[in-house]
Amino acid sequence: MGIRKLKPTTPGQRHKVIGAFDKITASTPEKSLVVGKKKTGGRNNTGKMTMRYIGGGHKQKYRFIDFKRTKDGIPATVKTIEYDPNRSSRIALLYYADGAKAYIIAPDGLEVGHTVMSGSEAAPEVGNALPLANIPVGTIIHNIELRPGQGAKMVRSAGSFAQLTSREGTYVVIKMPSGEVRRILSTCKATIGSVGNSDHALEKSGKAGRSRWLGRRPHNRGVVMNPVDHPMGGGEGRQSGGHPRSRKGLYAKGLKTRAPKKHSSKYIIERRKK
C-alpha cells in the first residue's frame, strides 16, 4: 500500500504520516452491504460510562464482512478494493458467479480482476479460503476460525499473518503473530496470504484533531488525578503514584489476567512472547 509523509507546512502536517490510497478503486461502498452505525460514546444502555476516552468522531457506516466464506466451489471476481473506517485493513468487494456480492478482508497482493474461491477444492492461492487440513505446511495464512463454521476470529488486522507449522492428528499447529503456538481443529477455515495495508503500523496522526476524527478522546494519566478518581492520584506535588495500578485497583504490570483453568489452555503449546 505505501505511506505518505507530508511537507511541514503547518505544525499538524510536520509529523503526519498517513496511508496511501492509491490502491483503493472505489469511494462509495456497495449499498446492499452497509448499515448505519450508532455511536455509544463509551456509555452502556443505562447511560453509565463503561469505556473511557471514547466519544465524538466522524459518522461511519458498518460494512458487512464475510468472515465465514461458506459459498464453497463458486468462483468470485474482485470488483473493487475499498477503505473501511471500522478496521485497519482494506476490504475487497467480490462478485460471485451466482450473482451474490460480499466483502472480504483484502489480503496483500489481491487486485481488481483476480478470481478467488473457498472450499476444500480451492487451490492454496492468495485470497482463497480453505480448511486447514487442505493447506500445505509452511503456508502464510490469516482470517483463522477457532471453531468450524464460526467465522474467522483471529489474524484480521492490517499486516498480520500466521503460519501453519505442522499437523497433529485432527489438529494443525499454527504460530500466531504474537509468537503463541497453538493447536486448531483442521476442519476450521483460514484464508491464504497475509492481511494487506501492512504499512498501517508506520502511520502517525500528526495532531490531536486526527485522533478526535477517529472518536478517540484525550487519555489522562492516573498519577495526575485526584485520589477519588484513581488509585495512583493525589499526593503533595508530583508523586510517583506508588505501584502502577488500573483505575479499578488491579496491578497494571505483571498481573496475570488469564483464567488459570481456562478450557482453551490445553490447545496452547507455547505462550505468546512479551
Swiss-Prot record:
One of its GO terms (biological process) is cytoplasmic translation. Residues 197-274 are annotated as: Disordered. GO terms for molecular function: rRNA binding; structural constituent of ribosome; transferase activity. One of the primary rRNA binding proteins. Required for association of the 30S and 50S subunits to form the 70S ribosome, for tRNA binding and peptide bond formation. It has been suggested to have peptidyltransferase activity; this is somewhat controversial. Makes several contacts with the 16S rRNA in the 70S ribosome. This is Large ribosomal subunit protein uL2. Transmembrane segments: none annotated. One of its GO terms (cellular component) is large ribosomal subunit. Keywords: Ribonucleoprotein, Ribosomal protein, RNA-binding, rRNA-binding. It comes from Porphyromonas gingivalis (strain ATCC BAA-308 / W83). Part of the 50S ribosomal subunit. Forms a bridge to the 30S subunit in the 70S ribosome. Belongs to the universal ribosomal protein uL2 family. The gene is rplB. InterPro entries: NA-bd_OB-fold, Rib_uL2_dom2, Ribosomal_uL2, Ribosomal_uL2_bac/org-type, Ribosomal_uL2_C, Ribosomal_uL2_CS, Ribosomal_uL2_dom3, Ribosomal_uL2_RNA-bd_dom. Residues 207-220, 244-274 have a biased composition (Basic residues).
